[in-house]
Amino acid sequence: MTDRVTVGNLRVARALYDFITDEALAGTDLDPDSFWSGVDKVVADLTPRNQELLARRDDLQAQIDKWHRQRAIGPHDADEYKQFLTEIGYLEPDPGDFTITTAGVDDEITTTAGPQLVVPVLNARFALNAANARWGSLYDALYGTDVISEEDGAEKGTSYNRVRGDKVIAYAREFLDGAAPLASGSYADATGFRIEDGQVQVELGDDQWVGLADPDQFVGYTGELGSPQWSILLRNNGLHIEILIDPDSPVGSTDKAGVKDVVLESAVTTIMDFEDSVAAVDAEDKVLGYRNWLGLNRGDLSEEVSKGDKTFTRVLNPDRTYTTPDGSGELTLPGRSLLFVRNVGHLMTNDAITDAEGNEVFEGIQDALFTGLIAMHGLKESDANGPLRNSRTGSVYIVKPKMHGPAEVAYTVDLFSRVEDVLGLPQNTLKVGIMDEERRTTLNLKACIKAAADRVVFINTGFLDRTGDEIHTSMEAGPMIRKGAMKSQPWIKAYEDQNVDVGLATGFSGRAQIGKGMWAMTDLMADMVEQKIGQPKAGATTAWVPSPTAATLHAMHYHQVDVYAVHKELEGKQRASLDDLLTIPLAKELAWAPEEIREEVDNNCQSILGYVVRWIDAGVGCSKVPDIHDIALMEDRATLRISSQLLANWLRHGVITEEDVKTSLRRMAAVVDEQNAKDPDFKPMATDPDSSIAFQAAQELILAGGTQPSGYTEPILHRRRREYKASVAGA
């Protein structure tokens, strides 16, 4: 039984109440009683509206399901379908031309294009690594990944391989030639660096010194001129590059110019995630996340890390200070990524707070209140608030996921306004990032932006969740194509193009981020470097990466592409059509061979089991899960949603049977067990699937997938995780 504190009509879990009262409110000048009274009032006033919005989702889905069932025989009539969606209010009127007016936004969001990390906030080590990933070693990123091949004696090995190191150095020199070219010659021939009359000069041998093609790219340096250990700071497309020189270092001693590393400004922004990458089902979990968020905003989060026989404490990096080129002043740059926080969406409740009747309070309301409160510590430096600051413009950046249409965005705006009143913050302090990951938001994106025109700081496409909603919305229309074929469908290209086009049409360039989705293949960095440049080329000012290393590698793309120049080329264009966006990804004919169907079912079942077993048994919401071919993929609830919805769709239309699903799950459970055999804490599923809560959760996600709200996985996952925690506690 959870110990609770009565606050008006609310019953707050003691762990949450004590944390907020004793830790989060400390140093804010807010009176605890007044704050909790405000929480009570916000919950009472906004809960009915939240419920109405969810009922509207269900009503629209029921009408769409009925429409498709009535037309099960015969071809799909696209014009009739579009008219129907308009009549029921699913498609809403275009709001006309406007420009967003969001003010007080940090440069990292408005004018600096670069990578964005998303990290589970429940894991302090991951959170610290991500916050510190503002700067990353290009040498390390190249040496440790497959961007540099292991051919011709360049194996990684267990100790430094000079052959591989030389390849890294050559790659970095070629990168510098593109990002900060010399007036003549190449960095590949550099034998020395110096500063003369406030300008950087590079020696190309035989005492031949050349400057930069654009001298203004040199913006600072560290160290004493003439000292062997120093660095040069360059800037290109708004991002910084630092060349570290130390001829006595292990790497510098092998380099003819004494360069020991090239450091890139990498994860310009990071999203600390309370949503799809975490497993937070109760007050205990939520407090862990809130406490880490507090440490990040106060600047005092730390974590003991062990590597081999060494243990050290990881803390947040300080800002970086450089001497200006003429030697007369200082330039200070942020040492940490600018932090967003992703709240949960409108659907879920959490028993961290209940009302007097025992009903759980909407988790999105809780997150807005508590993450907003905690973020106040990141707005100013003081003894009470901590030594570091997040925003330098006084803003709090909250990503709001899984909103369906303009009315839900308007509700979020009103929620944030009420939170500001409770916290005593100026209106529009809480900024919103709109995830364009639900079909009704995509189709009405301009109206969604209009609803938050004075708060919006980003729009972002999320292919996986968006595909999950695409399948669920049209669940009754017929069997869908295979998962791997989704990316080649007309609606996908239209979806990605429209997000950029609408963002530009509403004034995002220079004011807010236009984002694109995650690279999930965590070990395939060579492929990422080759392919992910397509996102900035398409107009994205940021795109998601799975690790600090990936952030450093992806940062190269923003040196190679001037995204704001791309915006000028794209402005005024409308590349996406509504007809393409409404094209349902139905299989034109069921021409799959039995082995193809089995492969698709096995692949999805393995993916579901591999992710769900860690979610339920270990409380891990974001996992590097090997797929059926042992390729490591970054999995979160979005990947789970699409996999479970596809199988639910095939089950609904008789492509597969319930027995096919159960048989595949049992077979794939053995595969997942084997993939996790080296984990001493892993509980095998295949030996007794009936008693494995994780196995049963995976099975339920598929068999009951057709009836889950919007195809979301959270209701089943949360219930089953609580069931597992209760079983462990009672053991």
Curated annotation (Swiss-Prot):
GO cellular component terms given for this protein: cytosol
Co-factor requirement: Mg(2+)
BP GO annotations: glyoxylate catabolic process; glyoxylate cycle; tricarboxylic acid cycle
Residues where acetyl-CoA binds: 118, 125-126, 277, 314, 546
InterPro entries cross-referenced by the UniProt entry: Malate_synth_C_sf, Malate_synth_sf, Malate_synthase_TIM, Malate_synthG, MS_C, MS_N, MS_N_TIM-barrel_dom, MSG_insertion
Molecular function via GO: magnesium ion binding; malate synthase activity
Binding site for Mg(2+): 437, 465
UniProt catalytic activity: glyoxylate + acetyl-CoA + H2O = (S)-malate + CoA + H(+)
Pathway assignment: Carbohydrate metabolism; glyoxylate cycle; (S)-malate from isocitrate: step 2/2
Keywords: Cytoplasm, Glyoxylate bypass, Magnesium, Metal-binding, Oxidation, Transferase, Tricarboxylic acid cycle
Chain positions found as Cysteine sulfenic acid (-SOH): 622
Protein's cellular compartments: Cytoplasm
EC annotation from Swiss-Prot or TrEMBL: 2.3.3.9
Active site, per annotation: 342, 636
Top-level lineage group: Bacteria
Binding site for glyoxylate: 342, 437, 462-465
Record has Transcription as a keyword: no
Function text: Involved in the glycolate utilization. Catalyzes the condensation and subsequent hydrolysis of acetyl-coenzyme A (acetyl-CoA) and glyoxylate to form malate and CoA.
Family affiliation: Belongs to the malate synthase family. GlcB subfamily.
Complex formation: Monomer.
Protein's recorded name: Malate synthase G
Phylogenetic placement of the source organism: Bacteria, Bacillati, Actinomycetota, Actinomycetes, Mycobacteriales
